[in-house]
Amino acid sequence: MADARSIRQQNQRSWDAVVPAHASHHRDVPTFVRAGGSSLFPEERALLGDVQGCSLIHLMCNTGLDTLSLANHGAVVTGVDISTAAITQARQWASDSGIQATFIQADIYDYLAETRDTYDRVYASYGTICWLNDLHAWANGIARILAPNGRFVLVEFHPTSNMFDAQWQLARAYPMGGRQLDIEGVGDYVAASGGGLSPTGFAAGVHDFVNPEPCHLFQWGVGEVVTALASAGLRITRLDEYLFCNGERPFADMVELPGRRMVAPPHVPDIPLLYGVAATKE
């Protein structure tokens, strides 16, 4: 069995392969953010609070559209991601838009252990937890880089949604325990969202992308995430669950509401599809 670092390096290769496909579906990001546009949803904005003048780091920031949006809300932003392709794209969008942002390519565990910087806000969102092989090292790293009275915010896909197959039938056990899940590769979920993840305007871009690089996920329950943060000395101030998805369409028959909000079709009972956590360092 591969060691954790080798797994993360393989995941980096999978992300590097898919980033050009994802980026191809966004129309003119620099113009969008230069005009003050924001890709953020109300849920993360509410949990983050007023970020005007705050130093903020966006962990596992991908290509940085949300990071640049946070700058438009007044934060002094840094984004960190393991993918070289993602950080290259983020830096290009920042340069072309004139938005001030720092983007760092690094393994998240290395960054959290080695940086000397601290931040008023630490933010992670939408598909980050599944790439973490060690929740406690992650949470301890967050506590380390938070400034006193700083706030950590997570908005994430609810693991309950992974229990269902494409027809909304219960098919799998609740994801937890850090079980490793090996899949063919990071897919083109931006294309599959049909514009839900392209607030700048959807472009057809790359068609029928197939990732040649497999990847490896880790399955964690909500309780495990919250416990890791609390064990790191953070005080949990909010734990919210939401009966909708923002942007992404994990089931093909989801109904899109205004604001790029995706809900289950009428015949499906409500289940939590997202959750949000806010925690402070005291």
Task: Give the ranges of each region predicted by the language model.
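N-terminal, positively charged/glycine-rich alpha-helical extensions of SAM-dependent methyltransferases
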Residues: 1-29
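Conserved alpha-helix/loop element of class I SAM-dependent methyltransferases that forms part
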Residues: 27-54
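Class I SAM-dependent methyltransferase SAM/SAH-binding core
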Residues: 54-111
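A short acidic, Gly/Pro-enriched loop at the edge of an enzyme's catalytic core
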Residues: 113-122
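A short glycine-rich, Lys/Arg-flanked "PGG" loop and its adjoining helix->strand segment in the class I
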Residues: 136-151
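Conserved class I S-adenosyl-L-methionine
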Residues: 151-203
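Short alpha-helix
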Residues: 216-239
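Core SAM-dependent methyltransferase catalytic element
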Residues: 232-234, 256-258, 262-282
